[in-house]
Amino acid sequence: MMRKWLYSTNHKDIGTLYFMFGIWAGMVGTSLSLLIRAELGNPGSLIGDDQIYNTIVTAHAFIMIFFMVMPIMIGGFGNWLVPLMLGAPDMAFPRMNNMSFWLLPPSIMLLISSSIVENGAGTGWTVYPPLSSNIAHSGSSVDLAIFSLHLAGISSILGAVNFITTIINMRPNNMSLDQMPLFVWSVGITALLLLLSLPVLAGAITMLLTDRNLNTSFFDPAGGGDPILYQHLFWFFGHPEVYILILPGFGMISHIISQESGKKETFGCLGMIYAMMAIGLLGFVVWAHHMFTVGMDIDTRAYFTSATMIIAVPTGIKIFSWLATLHGTQINYSPSMLWSLGFVFLFTVGGLTGVILANSSIDVTLHDTYYVVAHFHYVLSMGAVFAIMGGFVHWYPLFTGLALNPYLLKIQFFTMFIGVNLTFFPQHFLGLAGMPRRYSDYPDTYTSWNIISSLGSYISLVATMLMLMIIWESLINKRIILFPLNMNSSIEWYQNLPPAEHSYNELPILSNF
């Protein structure tokens, strides 16, 4: 038992560990988000002052990003599916794969420690100085958060190296890059983004660490530094990061839609690959659209506005290719199909509010209001999370060999759908009316929409608990899958369900069709 789970070098076992860790962290993050919505459910103070509130917000963001979405998408689905889809016996560096996982529990422990010592790190997930300096945040909270980020970053970089090596070196002999499954492509591009962006974050937070403890002044104007430098460094990581969070979701949705449509491949397969590459590349040249209010030159703002809008083009290509894949099929509203359709629609809504925010002139007004919160929660809470849910219910029979109850899954989908939309749609109105982010209290004008938003969060909580109940029900009833309804073009379903410990004893042969 100890050898299997602690010292594992098997991509499936490590993937399962990532899933268990991510689901646990997701429940912690959800609990924090409910604390936020409980505080905002009515005017006046509930939990305490803004420092406590902002500590909760900061922890919620870090946990959801670094310990829920990334471990599940890249660690869970990536580890499980990339070797199976490539026909590889395992990942390229199995022991490094194990280390990537085991760096995460210490990392989350450091993050939780940062909340419970001193006053907590109430900086927001961006950790901007001078608020995060040792004057405004004395004590070790921010330092612990920085070390937590270091560990999570090392974990992701090692994982990225592993995926890139696996994808380049462990394909079947005659499989060219354009024949690779879209999910493998999406994980490969994600890994490349991680590899290029995380070192910049590491540099920024290390400089912040020395500013706080070793008396340097990288971000302190009194010593010739500039806090804006930190913002540039952080967002040079932070913007690719949001594409890292969504790209594997794109890959999963492509697979689910083409398989559920009964098509042998996604419409415009090659275009999908180029679109993901374009999104990855453009993701690196638009970072300052997070900084339209710091007083940049007008030409700079014009450039970042237009460059940001260009990202909508490859994203649109993906949306329309998914719709074209669905075209002409008799749609079977299975749970995984419902999640995919929900993803396409709600991700599009989130993308449209993003295009609005890309206008620097409008963003000056909307920056740091709930409009921004609504925008990124539409693409994360209804993009990334819907993709995770869809991928999970789609590949669960492959991972476990068991069936989930489709009737309960549909009830769960509609509960969650109503919950998240009720939570985040009203926040657009709050933002347009000027309600600022990161405050625990607000003028009475904003009360009604906040009550509705908080109500939605309670519905989402019920949906989350329902999902856990469905998984539990499946595990105790053990409805064993007899045969998968797969297309010939998805080779992961040719395994036993669940797959054997060693799935490919010899490399599969690719035939031209």
Swiss-Prot record:
GO BP terms, alphabetized: electron transport coupled proton transport; mitochondrial electron transport, cytochrome c to oxygen
InterPro entries: Cyt_c_oxase-like_su1_dom, Cyt_c_oxase-like_su1_sf, Cyt_C_Oxase_1, Cyt_c_Oxase_su1_BS, Cyt_c_oxase_su1_dom
Binding residue positions for Mg(2+): 367-368
UniProt keyword Transmembrane helix present: yes
Binding site for heme a3: 375
The keyword Heme is annotated on this UniProt entry: yes
Residues binding Fe(II)-heme a, per UniProt: 60, 377
Membrane topology term: Multi-pass membrane protein
Disulfide bonds: none
Assigned EC number: 7.1.1.9
Cofactor: how bound: Binds 2 heme A groups non-covalently per subunit.
Subunit-level organization: Component of the cytochrome c oxidase (complex IV, CIV), a multisubunit enzyme composed of a catalytic core of 3 subunits and several supernumerary subunits. The complex exists as a monomer or a dimer and forms supercomplexes (SCs) in the inner mitochondrial membrane with ubiquinol-cytochrome c oxidoreductase (cytochrome b-c1 complex, complex III, CIII).
Protein name: Cytochrome c oxidase subunit 1
Protein species of origin: Choristoneura fumiferana (Spruce budworm moth)
Gene: COI
